[in-house]
Amino acid sequence: NNNAIITSSGNLTGKAGARIDYSTKSTIEDLVNKGYVLVNDGFPAGAVYDNDDGTTQIFSVILKHGTVPVTPENPGKPGEPINPNDPDGPKWPDGTDEKSVKRTGTQTIHYEGAGDKTPSDDVQTFDFTKKMVVDKVTGKIIDSGEWNVTSHTFGYKDTPVIDGYHADKRNAGGTVVTPDDLNKTVTVTYKSN
């Protein structure tokens, strides 16, 4: 994160040529549990103190913020921890639940007027989906994503023929839904001949 120092081992001292009694393992594991991703562990196994008192040995361990995709198959759970091994860490933000990445549009063709011969409603659906990205360290949405399409036009359906009745539409449908305007109804009315 802008090359910020996350943590440090502090100053370690020892005799020249002696093995440095330190391990990055537990610190890295702790940071990974908090959402970081290891880029490079610059502290080599078996590192030893040098024999130059005028130079400070510096070993850099580089990590970056981990991210997690939010999809209809893998939605966030607002208020719950993003990182299961860090229950006190960042929580899923509002706007990452399934309804935020998947919205289902419907076209309902509603038939009426033919008594018990009236057909059942014809319902068609279309799913608008998108992928978001959340920073596992900060818990912020870093990419809110775009919907797979901005609108969907449903097809037309031929109106069922019922003996003794005529309908006000030969076919019905063709409605347009968007992620913000999801449900459309078209009514077909039958009248007796």
For each feature predicted by the language model, list its residue ranges.
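Residues that cap or initiate secondary-structure elements
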Residues: 67-69, 115, 132-134, 153, ...
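Residue-level detector of beta-strand face positions
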Residues: 30, 108-110, 132, 158-159
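Surface-exposed interfaces of beta-sheet-rich extracellular modules
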Residues: 20-54, 69-77, 144-177
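Intrinsically disordered, low-complexity segments
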Residues: 6-7, 142, 190
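Short, ordered, surface-exposed loop/turn motifs in non-cytosolic proteins
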Residues: 2-11, 115-136
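Acidic/polar residues at beta-strand termini and the immediately following turn/coil
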Residues: 1-2, 21, 113, 133-141, ...
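Conserved "repeat-terminator" motif of extracellular CCP/Sushi domains
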Residues: 1, 49-112, 169-193
